[in-house]
Amino acid sequence: MLMVISPAKTLDYETPPATQRFTQPQYLDHSQELIQQLRELSPAQISELMHVSDKIGGLNAARFGSWTPAFTPENAKQALLAFKGDVYTGLDAQSFSEANFDYAQKHLRMLSGLYGLLRPLDLMQPYRLEMGTKLANARGKDLYAFWGTRISEWLNEALADQGDDVLLNLASNEYFSAVKRTALNARIINTEFKDQKNGQYKIISFYAKKARGLMSRFVIQEKINDPALLKQFDVQGYRYSAEQSKPDNLVFLRDHAPE
C-alpha cells in the first residue's frame, strides 16, 4: 500500500533532523523549470499570484532566488521533517525510528507544487508554491497542466516498487487533483475523518488534517499492507463507521477530541 499526503505551508528548518540519512529529489529538472519562471516575478507579483502578504511574497522571492539544484544537508532538509503543518503534527516523524523511516520511504509520498512528488527522505529546499496556484507556464495555464500525467506515472512506479496497486489517498482535494486517475494503475482508497459537533458528525478541517497524519503514522508503525486492516485505526478516539463507509471510502468518527 502506498500513501499520498499534501505538503504544508509551514516549514521547520531549525529543529535538527531525527535522521542523518537523506535522498535526492527525483524530478529536479522539472522544479528548475518552474524556479526559472518564478525568478522572473517581482515580490509584488509573487504576492499577487499566491494571494499572500508582501512579507510572505518577499520571503518566497528570496527563496526562489537562492534555490540551487545542488541539494545538501546544509541548504536543505528531508521533506518529511521540513514540513510542519497539521498533517505533520499527526505524523510526528521527529519521533520515528530508523525502521519507521525505512518503511515510510517505500510507502509514503508527498505531493508538491514545486517538486511534483517527494519521498520522505528527499532533501527539500524551502519554498511555497501551492498546487492550485494559477501559474501560466509553457505546458499550460496552471500547475495541474505543468505536471500533467507525470505525477500519476511516478506513482505507478512507486506502487510497482512496493508490491501492490493500493493507493491510500490522505491528501487534500487541491493536491490529489494533480493525480490523473485515468493514468493511474491503482485501486484508490479515500478516507474521511469526522468529529461530532452540535450532535452531528462533520469534517472539521483542523482535526481532519491531523487525522490524515495520524493515519499515516498508524500505517507506518504497524506496517499495514492490507486495506482491511485500516478499519482498526482507533487513534485519539476515532473509530471506523461501517454504516457510513463504502469499500473504497473509509469513514472514521470521533465524539470528543483529546484535551
From Swiss-Prot:
GO terms for cellular component: cytosol. It comes from the Bacteria. InterPro entries: YaaA. GO terms for biological process: response to hydroperoxide. NCBIfam families: PRK02101.1-1, PRK02101.1-3. Belongs to the UPF0246 family. PANTHER family: PEROXIDE STRESS RESISTANCE PROTEIN YAAA (PTHR30283:SF4), PEROXIDE STRESS RESPONSE PROTEIN YAAA (PTHR30283). This is UPF0246 protein Pfl01_0961.
